[in-house]
């Protein structure tokens, strides 16, 4: 039944109940019932979620009000399936070992530290099929990401050009599960996903990331093209395409998809260990396709309530 039909039905019920005598008190009560009806209606283009559920996903992700939360009881050995978590632990352990790590004049990590981190190969960074040669911190987005998240989360501090652990950082090294929870919350809620790219929109993909998690929870166990999720996201939030312009033979929708896939999968969920991807075809021949599905960590770490 359409929302307008429901409103008409409620109105008729009130008229019948009060024999046509509608007081301000009754009108206020009726208005509240109408708003509740609107906010709890199912939206077909948003996988049947209601406006109320979408609002909670957008503004209260991972809280008790959201339909998506993190599993606080995740075992340490399961948490350690996350590549970014392992890189973060290694980073914090190096700082702990050095006690006070002296940075370069530009406040970057020393080259030997960057090489030590990158040599662990927790995360593969490449441009298409070409490996990136890492010399400095600026050559590795994943290392920069771990450093930024660690600072935002209060795990490290810098004083007089020297980097050291906080008491919080030292404590979290003993609990990979708690570290993963804090890292994930900071990545989704405080770190700006646009930090490492030049896309025009600053909020696309991150604002609404909770909805992507719902989509993956529903469809992710079976491999699908990455564009499937971008298009599903666009169906629920069509206005986001307005933030992109046509150019280089791309429509605004195509430009959005490229931004969404890069931020959500390539520099987010893949590195967190929540999804895995597979490529087929050839880019130069125009036959390239990328496929994605969720990992066991995704299902062990995320909880979906009333979805």
Which stretches of residues belong to each language-model region?
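Leucine-rich, amphipathic alpha-helical/linker segments
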Residues: 56-98, 176-232
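Short helix-coil junctions and helix-kink-helix linkers
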Residues: 117-118, 122-140, 232-259
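Short amphipathic alpha-helical interaction segments
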Residues: 137-152, 159, 252-272
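Extended intrinsically disordered, low-complexity coil regions enriched in Ser, Thr, Gly, Ala
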Residues: 223-246, 276-277, 281-282, 286
């Amino acid at each position: 039944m359409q929302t307008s039909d429901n409103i008409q039905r409620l109105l008729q019920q009130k008229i019948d109940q009060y024999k046509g005598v509608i007081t301000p008190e009754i009108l206020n009560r009726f208005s509240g019932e109408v708003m509740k009806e609107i906010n709890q209606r199912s939206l077909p283009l948003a996988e049947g979620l209601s406006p109320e559920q979408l609002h909670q996903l957008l503004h209260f992700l991972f809280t008790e009000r959201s339909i998506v939360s993190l599993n606080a009881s995740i075992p340490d050995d399961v948490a350690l399936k996350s590549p970014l978590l392992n890189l973060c632990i290694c980073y914090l352990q190096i700082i702990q070992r050095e006690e006070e790590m002296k940075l370069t004049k530009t406040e970057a990590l020393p080259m030997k530290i960057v090489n030590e981190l990158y040599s662990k190969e927790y995360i593969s960074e490449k441009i298409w099929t070409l490996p990136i040669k890492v010399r400095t911190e600026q050559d590795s987005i994943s290392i920069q990401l771990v450093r930024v998240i660690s600072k935002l989360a209060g795990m490290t501090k810098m004083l007089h050009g020297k980097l050291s652990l906080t008491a919080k950082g030292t404590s979290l090294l003993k609990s990979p599960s708690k570290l993963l929870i804090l890292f994930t919350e900071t990545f989704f809620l405080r770190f700006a996903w646009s930090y490492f790219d030049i896309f025009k929109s600053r909020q696309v993909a991150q604002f609404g990331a909770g909805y992507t998690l719902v989509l993956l929870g529903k469809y992710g166990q079976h491999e699908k093209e990455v564009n499937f999720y971008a298009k599903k996201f666009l169906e629920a939030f069509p206005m986001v395409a307005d933030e992109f312009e046509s150019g280089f033979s791309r429509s605004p929708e195509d430009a959005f998809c490229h931004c969404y896939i890069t931020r959500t999968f390539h520099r987010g969920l893949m590195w967190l260990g929540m999804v895995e991807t597979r490529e087929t075809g050839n880019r130069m021949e125009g036959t390239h396709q990328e496929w994605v599905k969720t990992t066991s960590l995704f299902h062990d770490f995320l909880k979906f309530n009333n979805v």
